[in-house]
């Protein structure tokens, strides 16, 4: 069951997604940076969602439960799906948005690069899956992040390229990629005109 709402005047949305594995509610406000600390039951995922909100300057609330006693994959992927649905709702017709965003983020020995397009077309190119990244961060791996971003892209209609230019330690790799994603998204959702950024007349 999914419950969705979008206000008529503000770029906000609330989405609830319930399955046999997870129950997730995401509230997203693209124009207010006031956020609520995330509560997913997974400490490192909460940390990354907080980084996403802060570096993306997003109003974000995520409340989630899931079958963490099995493995965090379902919860992490489903939070990405629900966040993507919320972004799609909040953007509405996407008129006036900058559309494109990119960011480099260093974290000690790590350097991440993210480029995205709010095109309405879903695609994820995730380069780090071909690299040797060491270990995990609080039970979260870069493969979990890939599934989070894949779910997000598929349900938000976003083309996303993620590159790891340097780094191997999982905590730094994941955090740098999330922060680069947040900063690229921050630029792409900005309203910079009254026109649609497409020669087709549709995003």
Swiss-Prot record:
User: Cellular component per GO?
Assistant: cytoplasm
Q: Which HAMAP family does the UniProt record give?
A: HisB (MF_00076)
Coiled-coil regions listed: none
Q: Which EC number(s) does UniProt give? A: 4.2.1.19
NCBIfam families recorded:
PRK00951.2-1 (NF002111), PRK00951.2-4 (NF002114)
Q: Which domain of life is it from?
A: Bacteria
For this protein, what is any one GO molecular function term?
imidazoleglycerol-phosphate dehydratase activity
- Organism, per UniProt? Deinococcus geothermalis (strain DSM 11300 / CIP 105573 / AG-3a)
> Which key words are in the record?
Amino-acid biosynthesis, Cytoplasm, Histidine biosynthesis, Lyase
Please classify the protein's predominant subcellular localization into one broad category: cytoplasm
Q: Which PROSITE patterns match?
A: IGP_DEHYDRATASE_1, IGP_DEHYDRATASE_2
Which compartments does it reside in?
Cytoplasm
Question: What is the protein name given in its UniProt record?
Answer: Imidazoleglycerol-phosphate dehydratase
Answer yes or no on keyword Lyase: yes
- Disulphide bridges: none
Q: Which GO terms describe its biological process?
A: L-histidine biosynthetic process
Q: In which pathway does it act?
A: Amino-acid biosynthesis; L-histidine biosynthesis; L-histidine from 5-phospho-alpha-D-ribose 1-diphosphate: step 6/9
Chain's gene name: hisB
Give the catalytic activity.
Answer: D-erythro-1-(imidazol-4-yl)glycerol 3-phosphate = 3-(imidazol-4-yl)-2-oxopropyl phosphate + H2O
Give the PANTHER family listed for this entry. Answer: IMIDAZOLEGLYCEROL-PHOSPHATE DEHYDRATASE (PTHR23133:SF2), IMIDAZOLEGLYCEROL-PHOSPHATE DEHYDRATASE HIS7 (PTHR23133)
Q: Which family does it belong to?
A: Belongs to the imidazoleglycerol-phosphate dehydratase family.
Q: Which InterPro entries match?
A: IGPD_sf, ImidazoleglycerolP_deHydtase, ImidazoleglycerP_deHydtase_CS, Ribosomal_Su5_D2-typ_SF
């Amino acid at each position: 069951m999914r419950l969705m709402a979008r206000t008529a005047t503000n770029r906000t949305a609330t989405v609830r997604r319930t399955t046999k594995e997870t129950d997730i509610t995401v509230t997203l406000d693209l124009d207010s940076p006031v956020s609520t600390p995330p509560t997913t039951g997974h400490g490192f995922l909460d940390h990354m969602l907080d980084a996403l909100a802060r570096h993306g300057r997003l109003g974000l609330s995520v409340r989630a439960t899931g079958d963490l006693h099995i493995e965090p994959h379902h919860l992490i992927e489903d939070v990405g799906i629900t966040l993507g649905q919320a972004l799609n709702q909040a953007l509405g017709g996407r008129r006036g948005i900058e559309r494109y965003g990119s960011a480099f983020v260093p974290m000690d020995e790590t350097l991440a690069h993210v480029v995205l397009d709010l095109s309405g077309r879903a695609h994820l190119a995730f380069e780090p899956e071909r690299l040797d990244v060491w270990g995990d961060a609080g039970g979260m791996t870069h493969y979990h992040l890939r599934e989070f971003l894949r779910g997000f892209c598929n349900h938000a209609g976003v083309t996303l390229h993620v590159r790891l230019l340097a780094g191997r330690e999982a905590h730094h790799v994941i955090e740098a990629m999330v922060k680069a994603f947040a900063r690229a998204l921050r630029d792409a959702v900005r309203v910079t005109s009254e026109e649609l950024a497409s020669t087709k007349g549709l995003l």
